[in-house]
Amino acid sequence: MIAAVIKYLSYKVELTIMILALLLCLLAMYNPTLQFKKSITSYMLLVDVSQSMNAEDLVVEDSPITRINYTKILLKQIIDKSDCGSFFSINIFVADNVANIIEPVEKCNNYDELMDTINKLEWRMAWKGNSRITFGIKSAAKMQDSLNFPSKILFFTDGDEAPKVNAINRVNLDDFNLGEELIFVGVGGDTPVPVKRYNSRNMYVGYWGSDIYDSLPGATGSRNSDSGKDEPDPSVASADYERYLSKLYEEYLISLSEQIKSQYI
């Protein structure tokens, strides 16, 4: 009896193997491909490189870090967590405009180039010292059109504008139509901190003074240029109470995102 059962099971196993082999042969004739669901993304990474992004008010692994360096970490994490086939462009926001550094490229084929470009992002890339975010997002919309590549815009900024928005310099955004294609990513802390100032050799020389607008034309100020890029010894605050203080202007960015129907994270 036992021998008969074993013989029967052995026959069933051999039959099953033969059927599976036949099915595999049939599948091979049609050259099948396995379809895996991938998270394919396309992002226009936009980084604020204004001087306020040199403020050191974030912490990574128990060590203080500047806003710009924290942004670099975020950029790398976003790229690393995206699948091959995802596309990224790298852009910078300066004053009232946006400049493209790398046009949209596929992640895996251009990984080293993307990482190298992120590592080199810094304040000396700026050609002006002022910061007008409302002008910047309009410029970002034009840049997105010129790149001719559908993508979401991730705008990394602390929201610290110079000059501050008021009734005189406020920009009308009624015609802005990016909506959910734009996401503000707030970078910085809630507590105001002084902003480090560097000279033309990128050496720390002190902190920005609170009088940064005094010598500028116009009642609202403009911080049109930053001589620190060209001077070995730019002026700095001489006392703690003279320092210009900066923070993450989260409420302003949230208000702005609601106004143009975009997102803030």
Task: Tell what function each PLM region has.
Residues 42-52, 87-93, 152-156, 181-185:
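Soluble periplasmic/extracytoplasmic beta-strand elements of cell-envelope proteins
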Residues 57-66, 101-104, 121-129, 239-244:
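Second-shell loop/turn segments in exported
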Residues 40-41, 53-87, 106-110:
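…and closely analogous acidic/polar surface helices at protein-protein or active-site interfaces
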Residues 1-45, 50-60:
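Acidic, polar low-complexity linker/tail segments
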Residues 42-44, 251-265:
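Juxtamembrane amphipathic/hinge helix adjacent to a transmembrane helix
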Residues 48-50, 140-143, 149-168, 185-189, ...:
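DG-centered beta-turn motif at the end of beta-strands
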Residues 159-251:
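VWA/integrin I-like adhesion module and closely mimicked acidic/polar interface patches used
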Residues 87-120, 143-144:
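Short beta-strand-loop
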